[in-house]
């Protein structure tokens, strides 16, 4: 009985934790891909936006993140680069619209079409 109660408790904690993490799907108009955003602190100045291949074994495509100070971009090669010394240009009321635009810009810069 105690094991069952512990299992239920940890399941609830996990569900509540995931709900508080607040993953949001942003507009991303690329077939079979999705853009997921979540905040990680600093009054929403720490955040991660990740482009994933929907329903894929290796879903990672790109990531843009702010650590409350600098802006980082990681492409499908897995190399993380500092792309701005601060996140001010994105941490505005239009953040959810600006993030997809910036990811597309960085993808074309670091992964130009062949």
Give the ranges of each region predicted by the language model.
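Flexible, solvent-exposed short loops/turns enriched in glycine
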Residues: 59-89
